[in-house]
Amino acid sequence: MGKAQRTKGAAGEREICELIFQNLGIQVHRNLSQTRDGGADIKLNPYSIEVKRRAAIGNIYEWMDQASNGCDPGERPIVVCRADRKEWLA
């Protein structure tokens, strides 16, 4: 993964953190060790959130598998994705 892709992904994760705060009043943070240790991009108990920010929406089933694999016991996976110049989908 190139630097531009990592930057775009991190920006998407920050957008979702901000949207969660604006809509739910809950402060959440990115999982900065996700690349090294695996796991979800964002944890919001009982949810494990995988964020995808891409030029176009890809294989959502693969993303859901990734989100499921990043869950701790008792958590529910959520995939949040956005294609360029489109709205977020969950």
Predicted segments with their positions:
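Catalytic phosphate/metal-binding cores of nucleic-acid and nucleotide-processing enzymes, i.e., regions
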Residues: 1-90
